[in-house]
Every structure is written in structure tokens, then in C-alpha cells.
């Protein structure tokens, strides 16, 4: 797992909608940025520039830009945060659907945590794929090979279960994108014992 380090900066996009799960979102964005990965948080709500987007517990985040300004060719990975309401909004957003399809068609990584694998299911992207999710949405993932591991990697699809697995999920993403040494550096910096 992981790629050889190159001079190119790895780029990740994180779409954000009202009702996102804060722990999952902030943990992933923070850990990836600590690893030197360029992370763009793209708001799917209306408005330009996008205003603050409220998470499921009321914490507000301001996206870097609107999803309308995102080009799939600019990114190596997309990470879909959970939070049921946020995931439901991502399911309905045609721009997110186009972005997912383009990334998949170009053999890029797709990652989803908690309720977010339902976004992939709603776009017919999980049939025969091994994945996991928050237990509350398991029944919405028909056609997938469901696995209860905390983080599941199936080719270029990475899924995880929920807020309590966010750090492990983020570190697996770092390993995939930047290698094991970078994971160890980040773990040492944040005092992670995973």
C-alpha cells in the first residue's frame, strides 16, 4: 500500500454539506494536511463564496470553495464525510455525482466514512465491492460485500465506520497516498498509538 514519494503534491477534495459529522471531517482534513497533502474542502450548499456549513452538532466550518469550482482532474482522491443529513445531501447533488464518476473513471481513490458509503450506493458504485459503514446504514448498501472491520480497503475504494474510527481511517489514507514512513511521522507528531 502507498506510492513512492514524488515531487508532485497529492491533492484531496472533501465535499461538505449541512449535517456533516464534525469528528470525521476535521480529523481527516487535519491528518492529511499534517502529512503534506493539499486538501480542498468544497461546500455543496448554495452561495458564492460558500458560507459556513453547520455540522450535526452545530460546529460550523467554512469551505475553501464551492463544489462548482472543483475539477476532478485536479484531485487524486475524494473523501466523503459522514453524518446522515450531510450524506443525504451529497447523494442528491449532481455535481458530487459527476465528480465521483469522473474520479472512478480515471482510477482515482474514493473514500467514504460513516453514512457516506450510501452516497456511493445511490450512484450504483458499490456492487460487488467490499466495504464498511456505520451500522445504522448497513441495510442501504445492498449489493456490496459488507465487512465490519474498522477500515476496509478494496482497490481504490476506502471505507470506515464512524467518528470512533476517523483517526485510523485518516492514517490509512495517508499510507495509501504518501507511504508508511509519512504515517509514522504523523503518528509521532499527534501522539497516536494506533
Pin down the residues of each PLM region.
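Extended, subdomain-level signal for the structured scaffold at the beginning of enzyme domains
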Residues: 1-108, 119-128, 140-148, 156-194
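Short, thiol/selenol-centered motifs that function as redox-active sites or metal-ligating centers
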Residues: 113-114
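Anionic-ligand binding patches
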Residues: 131
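Long, charge-patterned amphipathic alpha-helical coiled-coil/hairpin "stalk" segments used as oligomerization
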Residues: 135-137
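Cytochrome P450 catalytic-domain "roof"
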Residues: 153
Amino acid at each position: 500500500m502507498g506510492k513512492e514519494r514524488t515531487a508532485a503534491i497529492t491533492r484531496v477534495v472533501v465535499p461538505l454539506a449541512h449535517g456533516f459529522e464534525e469528528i470525521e471531517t476535521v480529523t481527516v482534513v487535519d491528518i492529511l494536511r499534517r502529512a503534506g497533502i493539499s486538501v480542498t474542502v468544497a461546500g455543496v450548499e448554495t452561495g458564492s463564496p460558500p458560507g459556513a456549513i453547520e455540522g450535526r452538532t452545530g460546529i460550523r466550518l467554512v469551505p475553501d470553495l464551492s463544489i462548482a469550482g472543483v475539477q476532478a482532474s485536479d484531485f487524486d482522491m475524494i473523501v466523503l464525510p459522514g453524518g446522515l443529513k450531510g450524506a443525504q445531501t451529497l447523494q442528491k447533488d449532481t455535481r458530487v455525482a459527476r465528480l465521483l464518476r469522473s474520479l472512478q473513471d480515471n482510477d482515482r481513490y474514493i473514500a467514504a466514512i460513516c453514512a457516506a458509503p450510501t452516497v456511493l450506493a445511490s450512484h450504483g458504485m458499490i456492487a460487488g465491492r467490499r466495504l464498511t459503514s456505520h451500522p445504522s446504514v448497513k441495510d442501504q448498501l445492498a449489493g456490496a460485500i459488507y465487512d465490519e472491520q474498522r477500515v476496509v480497503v478494496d482497490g481504490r475504494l476506502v471505507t470506515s465506520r464512524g467518528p470512533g474510527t476517523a483517526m485510523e481511517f485518516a492514517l490509512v489514507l495517508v499510507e495509501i497516498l504518501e507511504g508508511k514512513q509519512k504515517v509514522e511521522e504523523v503518528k509521532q507528531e499527534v501522539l497516536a498509538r494506533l
